[in-house]
Amino acid sequence: MTRRQFIPLAGIAATAGYASLKLQKPPKLSDGPPGNSAVSIVRARSYSEDLVSHMLEGVRQCGLEARGKRVLLKPNLVEFSSTTVINTDASIIAAAVELFHRLGASEVKIGEGPGHRRDTLDLADDAGYRSTIPKFESLFTDLNRDDVAPIQGFAGEPEFYFAKTVLAADLIVSLAKMKTHHWAGATLSMKNFFG
């Protein structure tokens, strides 16, 4: 085959391959309607209390089953200043890791992708995550740098891209930090899945 014969054939093959990829629909995030979210509020007077026991009480109130599931913990890590408390405290995350291991989760990961400061590991260090959470580096994924995959879209969009760590999780637990917010008044948990 000559070069003149090869180039048009290669172009046709590449176009056909690209077209077949575009015709495949990306997977859906869920096949069914959204389920109900369970919320439990359990009081701990300080971060030095037995947080695992408090969390276990909350999980039981919600009827949450974690055995054999891949769990992704999503803290709220924005930026760090020693004069503010805007991030999920490291002791909360450490307790949640221990809790889901005790409950038989097959895997527990921590995933975060801050929108303000882009060096997530430096931010995690400043917030005390690496020094407080056992095996932090092996548990943590920077969602800003994670590989992504498309899912079937909604609201008129053909598809959305999500971090593969998020898509691989059977259970995503928001460990949001309740705080005031200059636009919304209070953030509660509504913004925690943005970054």
Regions found by a protein language model. Give the residues of each.
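N-terminal and secondary-structure boundary signal
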Residues: M1-G195
